């Protein structure tokens, strides 16, 4: 498949990345965040990923199942914005994958993710971190 044909296929069906297995994938479950970090793509001017209408949880769960089954995805990385704003969705979707992972700012707590990976984003010691985080 060419880049153009992949793009056209994805526009028709968001789970169509060709007839290929992908061991790992990532998804931004939301572009909403409770912080306003100076370096974050969510808060850049003219960001095409800015917060807007979200996919409802049931639809997103179906998409996760389709992606897992269609592309044999074993590991899923949940990102955002702040993915734990949609904690119920993320924790339920994490059960679908052998190796779930979450990137979080930990302001909603650090989730328990047995068999998975939780990455907490920090920008240095408190005196450096806090001004960056807004």
Name each region found by the language model.
Residues 1-19:
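Radical SAM enzyme core and accessory elements
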Residues 3, 21-29, 52-56, 105-111, ...:
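Phosphate-binding glycine-rich loops and adjacent basic patches that engage nucleotide phosphates
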Residues 6-7, 42-43, 125-126:
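A short alpha-helix capping/helix-coil boundary motif
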Residues 9-15, 53-54, 59-61, 67, ...:
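Short secondary-structure boundary micro-motifs
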Residues 11-12, 48-50, 75, 130:
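A short, structure-level motif marking secondary-structure boundaries and short turns
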Residues 61-66, 70-78, 86-134:
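Radical SAM/AdoMet-radical enzyme domain recognition
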């Amino acid at each position: 498949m060419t880049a153009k044909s992949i793009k056209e296929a994805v526009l028709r069906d968001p789970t169509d990345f060709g007839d290929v297995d992908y061991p790992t994938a990532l998804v931004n479950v939301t572009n909403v965040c409770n912080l306003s970090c100076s370096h974050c793509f969510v808060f850049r001017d003219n960001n095409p990923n800015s917060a807007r209408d979200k996919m409802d949880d049931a639809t997103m769960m179906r998409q996760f199942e389709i992606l897992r089954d269609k592309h044999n995805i074993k590991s899923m990385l949940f990102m955002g914005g702040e993915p734990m704003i949609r904690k119920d969705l993320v924790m339920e979707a994490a059960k679908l994958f052998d190796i779930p992972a979450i990137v979080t700012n930990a302001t909603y707590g650090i989730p328990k993710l047995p068999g998975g990976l939780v990455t907490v984003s920090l920008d240095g010691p408190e005196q450096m971190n806090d001004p960056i985080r807004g």
